[in-house]
Amino acid sequence: MTKSELIERIVTQQGQLSAKDVELAIKTMLEQMSQALATGDRIEIRGFGSFSLHYRAPRVGRNPKTGQTVRLDGKFVPHFKPGKELRDRVNE
């Protein structure tokens, strides 16, 4: 599902909300979540899951085209851990 499809579904289910209001709410929520992760905060949405950063250590990779070894720096990557309610609902 894309962001546009999500907006359409919410507008369809919640007839009193306009598409612009829903779009603004979703964009604002995603921006706030991105900013929180960028500053190292953990985001927890009860019943859904949590977002955090995991550190990937520096390593030696390989360019698949040339086979040449490449040094890759360590970096933080976003990580999502689903909550129990979400896991249960998906496995129904």
From Swiss-Prot:
SUPFAM superfamilies attached to this UniProt entry: IHF-like DNA-binding proteins
Recorded GO CC terms: chromosome; cytosol
Keywords from the UniProt entry: DNA recombination, DNA-binding, Transcription, Transcription regulation, Translation regulation
Gene Ontology molecular function, alphabetical: DNA binding; structural constituent of chromatin
Record InterPro entries: Hist_DNA-bd (IPR000119), Histone-like_DNA-bd_CS (IPR020816), IHF-like_DNA-bd_dom_sf (IPR010992), IHF_beta (IPR005685)
Physiological role: This protein is one of the two subunits of integration host factor, a specific DNA-binding protein that functions in genetic recombination as well as in transcriptional and translational control.
Oligomer status and interactors: Heterodimer of an alpha and a beta chain.
Family under the similarity heading: Belongs to the bacterial histone-like protein family.
Name of the protein in its database record: Integration host factor subunit beta
Gene Ontology BP, a term: DNA recombination
Disulfides per UniProt: none
SMART domains in the cross-refs: BHL
Pfam family, one: Bac_DNA_binding
Organism: Azotobacter vinelandii (strain DJ / ATCC BAA-1303)
